[in-house]
Amino acid sequence: MSDIHEHKILILDFGSQYTQLIARRIREIGVYCELWAWDVTEAQIREFAPNGIILAGGPESVTADNSPRAPEYVFNAGVPVLGICYGMQTMSEQLGGKVIQGVGEGEFGYAQIEMLAESALFKGIEDAVSSDGKSLLDVWMSHGDKVSAIPAGFVAVAKTDTCPFAAMSCEEKRFYGVQFHPEVTHTRQGMRMLSHFALDICGCAANWKPSSIIEDAIERLKKQVGDDEVILGLSGGVDSSVVAMLLHRAIGKKLTCVFVDNGLLRLNEAKQVMEMFGDHFGLNIVHVDAENRFLDALKGEADPEAKRKIIGRVFVEIFDEEAKKCVNAKWLAQGTIYPDVIESAGSATGKAHVIKSHHNVGGLPDDMELGLVEPLRELFKDEVRKIGLELGLPYNMLYRHPFPGPGLGVRVLGEVKKEYCDLLRRADAIFIEELHKADLYNKVSQAFTVFLPVRSVGVMGDGRKYDWVVSLRAVETIDFMTAHWAHLPYDFLGRVSNRIINEVDGISRVVYDISGKPPATIEWE
């Protein structure tokens, strides 16, 4: 088996919103990489032994005092270095070039760069040709400052009308700087540039692929837990499902999954989880039907934050009770993924993987004394999904829209009651079914129904009814940080509304939420 960590790229984070995207792109190319804060030590870099280093972008100005710098060792390590945006500016400044503050002439958004010289980074890449025969590339810019003089030994590789050094290189040392963002899709050939860097310039092999990651994870799990028993909280979500499948492959019946049905799940979800993991895949699952316990604890509580805390607390109590019954369990498995690890590390702490444990399960009692197993902690969400497919999990489960941890507890506004949850489940199932039928489900990023605790007058036949209101919500987003409401066709919305009002006795009115984020959040609570 090839070592999936043998070749690797180190990405130093200077605070750009795009940094995780760079890491995901390098992984997509098939090369392992890690994301560390910019202030790492020489010893840490030596220990990691990267085949190449990428200096990412950042919001600071190189011209400001105390702005972040790459460790000097980066330029003496003998490996290729690629500086992106701020990374190019700090590389230039640190190696003897010059950076000036942009005054009113920064470049933000689409730009076309003109190639001035050949470079290994841009080999065979062009989007268009200018009238005087120069290669042109479509790129995405986001910078105020710019390099005004490049270091000795470097050549200008590309320019724009306002930026004389849109790209620079020192081919001898294999140092490259680009003022644009190759990692975003708006830079049309960005993936080819990053691929040139990782595979051709750094000489990495593309060993990082789902089948190899699975083999590696199973080997490591066997080594870590040996013949011990492991306990896992299985929610039916992507992360815990993939952890369950990996552990099942590695240790079989020594894994006990605890599935807690809190009464706040989607229609038939508990049944589907039990059928898939229990009957189909043959996992050892303890099914705890705790609907009444959760609803009793939530009685009379209308505050969203308090509801979240109650749901979390009751889950921990139940999980603790079940874990104590597994007297031989020595390990607790969790679905921690790489963005959780990065978040926990923060900047200015050195190496990004020296972290505080990220407890997805939340505040589990210390007296459990279980070791922690986190087989997904190196993976991004899109990688977890690809691994899930390779492990045989169904596509529609892995690529389902996000569902909040507290479930319908935060989609029923105000106090949560069984009657409200049952109505909401059925209304939501109709909305999702119709989205699939109309081939719209995968065109929106997230869609769901919200129960509003208000009554509205309706007419059914000759009679009047006074029943509840639900709101449909559908958004389009890239990163869930900002979102637009989805412009679903009116006839589609009309069809969904008619079905819900006619088929779900107790709902008399359906509205559509047209709020963006900001100012509204995606979920209502």
Curated annotation (Swiss-Prot):
How is this protein annotated for GO cellular component? cytosol
What is its pathway?
Purine metabolism; GMP biosynthesis; GMP from XMP (L-Gln route): step 1/1
Task: Name the residues annotated as catalytic in the UniProt entry.
Answer: C85 (nucleophile), H181, E183
GO BP, one example?
GMP biosynthetic process
Keyword Ion transport in the entry? The reply is no
- Looking at the record, the residues that make up the GMPS ATP-PPase domain are 208-400
Recorded catalytic reaction(s): these are: XMP + L-glutamine + ATP + H2O = GMP + L-glutamate + AMP + diphosphate + 2 H(+)
Q: Which UniProt keywords apply?
A: ATP-binding, Glutamine amidotransferase, GMP biosynthesis, Ligase, Nucleotide-binding, Purine biosynthesis
Keyword Ligase listed? The answer is yes
Which residues of this UniProt protein bind ATP? S235, G236, G237, V238, D239, S240, S241
- EC number(s) given by UniProt: 6.3.5.2
Query: Per its record, what are the GO molecular function terms?
Result: ATP binding; GMP synthase activity
Among the Pfam families in the record, one is NAD_synthase
Where does the record place the Glutamine amidotransferase type-1 domain?
8-207
Where, if anywhere, are coiled coils annotated? none
Query: Highest taxon of the source?
Result: Bacteria
Task: Kindly give the InterPro entries that the UniProt entry links to this protein.
Answer: Class_I_gatase-like, GATASE, GMP_synth_C, GMP_synth_GATase, GMP_synthase, GMPS_ATP_PPase_dom, NAD/GMP_synthase, Rossmann-like_a/b/a_fold
Which SUPFAM superfamilies does the record cross-reference, listed alphabetically?
Answer: Adenine nucleotide alpha hydrolases-like, Class I glutamine amidotransferase-like, GMP synthetase C-terminal dimerisation domain
Function in brief: Catalyzes the synthesis of GMP from XMP.
Subunit info here reads:
Homodimer.
Q: What is this protein called?
A: GMP synthase [glutamine-hydrolyzing]
The organism encoding this protein is Shewanella oneidensis (strain ATCC 700550 / JCM 31522 / CIP 106686 / LMG 19005 / NCIMB 14063 / MR-1)
- Source gene? guaA
